[in-house]
From Swiss-Prot:
Pro residues composition bias: residue spans: 314-323, 330-341
Localization in the cell: Nucleus; Cytoplasm
Coiled-coil ranges (or none): none
Record flagged with keyword Cell inner membrane: no
Region of interest (Disordered), ranges: 1-22, 39-60, 255-500, 513-540
Species of the source: Aspergillus oryzae (strain ATCC 42149 / RIB 40)
Protein's name in the database: Developmental and secondary metabolism regulator veA
GO biological process: positive regulation of penicillin metabolic process; sporulation resulting in formation of a cellular spore
Length: 574
């Protein structure tokens, strides 16, 4: 069977020219040359989203125009007048199939044109690659796949009457009535047509990709024309060993490999470094309900260089004689006492303080005498402080005592209803600077109290007098130690003077106490070394305090930070 011979290319493929005689008898020759042929395109379809994913014909077609002038009898001597010729040129592109197809009897009309984009281009006079007029089509797309050609039709608009055709009628360009608009008298005349070589329109699956921009496109773009320049290769390679239509996007591989970065082993400077755990001995007990806050405060104490709170152990009775006034090292702790029948003895109003995590102090086997000056009762286990008073921002404990008349009968209710912590801080020794941390040894404060040394000057020194020694108060309740050890699991007793009343109503209640009733008049934290009796803070009395003031105006008894009880005139009554 004989094969069909290939179709002969049309005579106007790539190049075409035409000549005409002007009214002055000169011969003008128009020559079109398709300098950059279209090679490939991707079908964009005809749907609603076709314009969003449209690929232009690659490379963009570029057609060169040259105009020559010569004598009608001498075609050898031609003069290039492309830049000097005064006229407007337009090139209109259409699409046709490369292989003509016979039409059917009832061929339906196409619903939409196959060629889309901008099919019209004006002339651009450029100096490179040569001085000529150029028509550029950077935005041409084809909707359906197949093999096509582009037809370029040249139209001219003459501006001077001498350049019109020799047989054309003379038209008056003057307007007799300038005030009235006149119909346009300019006309576009068709000059010639040129076709491109066949190119293939691929489907989206088979499209090989866009190639690198050609040198002609770069030269044209450098002179200000709108041409898309692609400096990277976007051709997809097909595998040689496979026969199916597998497309390999090399550019995608390059882009993904460029995103891979070596991990920084030195760490990013902007990433916050996690703070190490605190080495303080005030670790959080698992049963403590405020463990998160306790960890935060213990870490803050380590961060500022403070020593964490040590578990308080009851020291041995001190020997007679003066003790060192400034002792910054805590006493060596004794073995802790075994837990009582209520190991979860905690205050529900401690508000983040960590004093309730320490075991209760152990009682001595015999009652204390006046010479030993035993530590009085505390609703919370006592512990020594080793922090800077200028940076203290945590809640302190209120400085109120408890009435002796109700102490023996209501001692068993202390483990059930946690009492508020005390707020009073121990007095500073005479030879200790105000900026240094307070000593954590109770013996140091004991010796200072025995010698009745004056306190260091504070902003409220005029309001708080020196405290007398309390040796006479230690023997008021000799039998309370044995009674309280059986009911409150080895808790020290109060050392109160006779006739002293308490500020707190410690009776059992059916509901929780309010914050105001628990913390008394000073319900704010202490900052910059302030004391609870400083006038900088307003005094706000609780209901129990106001009831006490109405009943008596006697001295009040309060507990010192080192465990001793002291009496003085209430500042609110002065």
């Amino acid at each position: 069977m004989a094969t069909r011979a290939p179709l002969a290319p049309p005579p106007n493929e790539t190049e075409a020219s035409v000549s005409r005689i002007t009214r002055e008898g000169k011969k003008l020759t128009y020559k079109l040359n398709v300098m950059q042929q279209p090679e490939r395109a991707r079908a964009c379809g005809a749907g609603a989203k076709s314009s969003a994913d449209r690929r232009p014909v690659d490379p963009p077609p570029v057609v060169e125009l040259r105009v020559y002038e010569s004598d009608p009898n001498d075609d050898l001597n031609k003069t290039d007048i492309t830049f000097a010729y005064n006229a407007n040129f337009f090139l209109y592109a259409t699409l046709e199939t490369a292989r003509p197809m016979a039409q059917g009897r009832f061929a339906p009309n196409p619903t939409c044109p196959v060629l889309t984009g901008v099919p019209v281009a004006g002339v651009a006079y450029l100096d490179r690659p040569s001085q000529a007029g150029y028509f550029i089509f950077p935005d041409l797309s084809v909707r359906h796949e197949g093999v096509y050609r582009l037809n370029f039709h040249l139209y001219e608009e003459t501006k001077e009457s001498k350049d019109a055709n020799e047989n054309a009628p003379i038209q008056s360009l003057s307007n007799p009535m300038p005030s009235k608009p006149m119909a346009p008298k300019s006309f576009l005349e068709f000059r010639l047509e040129v076709v491109s070589v066949p190119f293939t329109v691929f489907s989206a699956k088979k499209f090989p990709g866009l190639a690198t921009s050609t040198s002609l496109s770069r030269v044209i773009a450098e002179q200000g024309c709108r041409v898309r320049i692609r400096r990277d290769v976007r051709m997809r390679r097909r595998g040689e060993k496979r026969t199916d239509d597998y497309d390999y996007d090399e550019e995608r591989v390059y882009r993904s490999s460029d995103r891979i970065s070596t991990p920084d082993t030195h760490g990013y400077a902007g990433t916050p470094v996690e703070r190490p755990r605190s080495t303080s001995t005030s670790t959080v007990d698992p049963s403590f309900p405020y463990g998160v806050d306790a960890q935060r405060r213990s870490s803050g104490a380590t961060e500022y260089g403070f020593q964490g709170a040590q578990p308080y152990q009851r020291p041995l009775p001190p020997a007679p004689g003066p003790a060192p006034a400034a002792v910054s090292t805590p006493a060596p702790p004794a073995p802790p006492a075994p837990p009582s029948h209520n190991p979860g003895y905690q205050s529900h109003l401690s508000f983040g303080s960590t004093q309730t995590q320490y075991p209760a102090p152990q009682l001595p086997p015999t009652p204390q005498t006046a010479s030993t000056l035993a530590a009085p009762y505390s609703p919370h286990p006592s512990y020594s402080h080793a922090r800077n008073p200028s940076t203290s921002a945590e809640y302190e404990t209120p400085g109120y005592s408890y009435p002796p008349s109700r102490m023996s009968t209501e001692r068993s209710s202390y483990p059930k209803n946690g009492l508020p912590p005390l707020r009073l801080e121990p007095p500073k020794p005479l030879n200790m600077p105000s900026g240094e941390p307070r000593s954590s040894d109770p013996n140091a404060y004991h010796s200072v109290a025995q010698s009745a040394a004056p306190r260091s000057q504070t902003p409220s020194s005029s309001l708080v007098p020196s405290l007398p020694p309390l040796k006479a108060l230690s023997g008021d309740y000799p039998n309370n130690l044995s009674q309280s050890s059986s009911s409150t699991s080895q808790s020290p007793s109060h050392d109160l003077g006779a006739g002293k009343k308490f500020f707190w109503d410690t009776g059992a209640s059916l509901s929780k106490r309010s914050y105001e009733d628990s913390f008394g008049h000073d319900d704010r934290p202490l900052y910059n070394g302030m004391r609870p009796d400083t006038e900088s803070y307003p005094r706000r009395l609780s209901d129990a305090s106001r009831n006490f003031y109405n009943e008596t105006r006697d001295e009040m008894a309060y507990k010192r930070a080192n465990g001793r009880m002291a009496t003085k005139i209430s500042p609110a009554l002065q």
